[in-house]
Amino acid sequence: MYIVFYSTSDVFKAEEILNNNNIECKVVPTPVQDKAYCGVCVETHDEQAKTLMEDLEFEVLE
C-alpha cells in the first residue's frame, strides 16, 4: 500500500515513526499524478502503519 501525504516533511516523519516501530517501509515516488500530494510517499505492506500515524494527514492508495 502507498501512504501519500501533502508535505514532504510528513513523509519523513511517517518513515521515522514506522522505522521506530519496526515496520518495514520505504520512501518512493508517489504513483499518482495529482498535484494535491507531494512527489514522494511511503510504501509498506503492514496494515498497522495507518494506526501509528494518526496525527499526520495522509491518504492510503492500495
Indicate residue ranges for each PLM-predicted region.
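Positively charged, small/polar-rich N-terminal and surface patches that mediate targeting and assembly
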Residues: 1-62
